[in-house]
């Protein structure tokens, strides 16, 4: 793999100003995560013009000196090829760097965090001891809180849940390696689902009860105000109704009086003022009696 910066190299003169600085970073890169990506990014940005080579150890050497990986060497190589900071992937990278390897790939600097990396091969105390001694080591910073070991520990901690999830998704017990525990795990899975349903129903019941309690409290707080408001509106309506009835009766009596006066004048008779006063008094009593009856009926309705 090459980049624009690499194409500028002419011949083998490492002193050329156009030649990018060749930086090498290596690792296992199992379960590639953002901690790996940040370390690679730091290596890439070590110099303004950097060509980054990333070495990845194969399965054989990794299993021998570090332990079993989750991903195969091919999967780990491919993960690195899809990281935007990587210019070139070097498969089958050596566990301990040598002068021959650095010269072969024309490596100017090796990037890694400064913590001593134990050399389990027995060649030395620190895998990067040699490049540090010749001044070709470029320090990067580790990302705290994330590592392949941390991810594996999370899976181990919640092992049963992940097994149950995959059984539920159709994986066989042979694929998961749980042939002796499958029945117990499936029973646990059903019990867990039942517990979740019971919990869900309990939450719904609590929500309904809480809502009902709120409505009950609201009614108790506002009942007196609502009833008082209704009675006030009802009394106002009765008053308006009584006024309308009285006005209507008075207008009718005035029309009757006018017609009677006109008829008596035509007959040449004199209207007696005393008789008129007596009739007006009777009509007013009739109007007041109607208003009282209407008010009494309204009050009886409210009581019901």
UniProtKB/Swiss-Prot annotation:
Named from the GO MF annotations, one term is: choline-phosphate cytidylyltransferase activity
Q: Does the keyword Lyase apply?
A: no
Temperature-related activity annotation: Optimum temperature is 30 degrees Celsius.
Pathway listed for it?
Answer: Phospholipid metabolism; phosphatidylcholine biosynthesis; phosphatidylcholine from phosphocholine: step 1/2
Q: Which BP terms does GO give this entry? A: phosphatidylcholine biosynthetic process
Reactions catalysed according to its record: phosphocholine + CTP + H(+) = CDP-choline + diphosphate
Q: Does the keyword Mitochondrion apply?
A: no
Q: What induces it?
A: By cold treatment.
Instruction: Tell me which domain of life the UniProt entry assigns to the organism this sequence originates from.
Output: Eukaryota
Q: Indicate which residues the UniProt annotation says bind CTP.
A: 28-36, 66, 112-113, 117, 142-146
Which residues of this UniProt protein bind substrate? 66, 95
Question: Do you know which Pfam families this protein is assigned to?
Answer: CTP_transf_like (PF01467)
Extract the ranges annotated as region (Disordered): 266-292
Q: Which UniProt keywords apply?
A: Lipid biosynthesis, Lipid metabolism, Nucleotidyltransferase, Phospholipid biosynthesis, Phospholipid metabolism, Transferase
**Phenotypic effect of disruption:** No visible phenotype under normal growth conditions.
Instruction: Quote the EC number.
Output: 2.7.7.15
- Write down the InterPro entries for this protein, in alphabetical order: CCT, Cyt_trans-like, Pcy1-like, Rossmann-like_a/b/a_fold
Please name the top-level EC class of this enzyme: transferase
Q: What is the stated purpose of this protein?
A: Plays an important role in the biosynthesis of the phospholipid phosphatidylcholine. Catalyzes the formation of CDP-choline.
The family line of this record is: Belongs to the cytidylyltransferase family.
NCBIfam families reported for this sequence: cyt_tran_rel
Return the protein name: Choline-phosphate cytidylyltransferase 2
Species of origin reads Arabidopsis thaliana (Mouse-ear cress)
